[in-house]
Amino acid sequence: MACGLVASNLNLKPGECLRVRGELAADAKSFVLNLGKDSNNLCLHFNPRFNAHGDANTIVCNSKDDGTWGAEQREVAFPFQPGSVVEVCISFNQADLTVKLPDGHEFKFPNRLNMEAINYMSADGDFKIKCVAFE
């Protein structure tokens, strides 16, 4: 995957939400949204996989602590279609992150690193970001 958008100094605090809207490639295989302190310390690695790394139509989430990946969490809800415009909302709380998918389905991912703020975001893969909002 080519290097996509990287943003730092976000200072997203518990109770706040990150809303990302973008367009999926017509031949999308996967895309990634990372949130955390930096590229080696991620409280959320959000990776919808259409057909990548042995997974099909699966969302894989993980965390990375000082460069070491944690245990993967897989979600069976997969409301993404290649070539479509999608919006994902991620609410940050002290205990977990709540991910709201385009179809309204929500799931939680634990804040394993006990981060008190999210300062880093990156996006990569078959996803062209159109809008990022902080609420």
Swiss-Prot record:
Keywords: Acetylation, Apoptosis, Cytoplasm, Extracellular matrix, Hemagglutinin, Lectin, Phosphoprotein, Secreted
Ranges for domain Galectin: 4-135
Activity under varying temperature: Retains hemagglutinating activity up to 42 degrees Celsius. The activity then drops and is completely lost at 65 degrees Celsius.
Locations listed in the record: Secreted, Extracellular space, Extracellular matrix; Cytoplasm; Secreted
Chain positions with Phosphoserine modification: S30
Broad class of the protein's primary localization: secreted
pH sensitivity of activity: Optimum pH for hemagglutinating activity is 7.4.
GO molecular function: lactose binding; laminin binding
Modified residues (N6-acetyllysine): K13, K29, K108, K128
One CC-aspect GO term: extracellular space
Chain sites annotated for binding a beta-D-galactoside: H45, F46, N47, P48, R49, H53, N62, W69, G70, A71, E72
Classification via InterPro entries: ConA-like_dom_sf (IPR013320), Galectin-like (IPR044156), Galectin_CRD (IPR001079)
UniProt cross-references to Pfam families, sorted A to Z: Gal-bind_lectin
Modified residues (N-acetylalanine): A2
Domain of life of the native organism: Eukaryota
Keyword Phosphoprotein: yes
GO BP terms in the entry: apoptotic process
Record carries keyword Protease: no
Residues modified to N6-succinyllysine: K108
Subunit record text: Homodimer. Binds LGALS3BP. Interacts with CD2, CD3, CD4, CD6, CD7, CD43, ALCAM and CD45. Interacts with laminin (via poly-N-acetyllactosamine). Interacts with SUSD2. Interacts with cargo receptor TMED10; the interaction mediates the translocation from the cytoplasm into the ERGIC (endoplasmic reticulum-Golgi intermediate compartment) and thereby secretion.
PANTHER family with a match to the protein in the record: GALECTIN, GALECTIN-1
Protein task: Lectin that binds beta-galactoside and a wide array of complex carbohydrates. Plays a role in regulating apoptosis, cell proliferation and cell differentiation. Inhibits CD45 protein phosphatase activity and therefore the dephosphorylation of Lyn kinase. Strong inducer of T-cell apoptosis. Has hemagglutinating activity towards human erythrocytes.
The name this protein goes by in its record: Galectin-1
Naturally occurring in which organism (per UniProt): Capra hircus (Goat)
Taxonomic lineage from the root: Eukaryota, Metazoa, Chordata, Craniata, Vertebrata
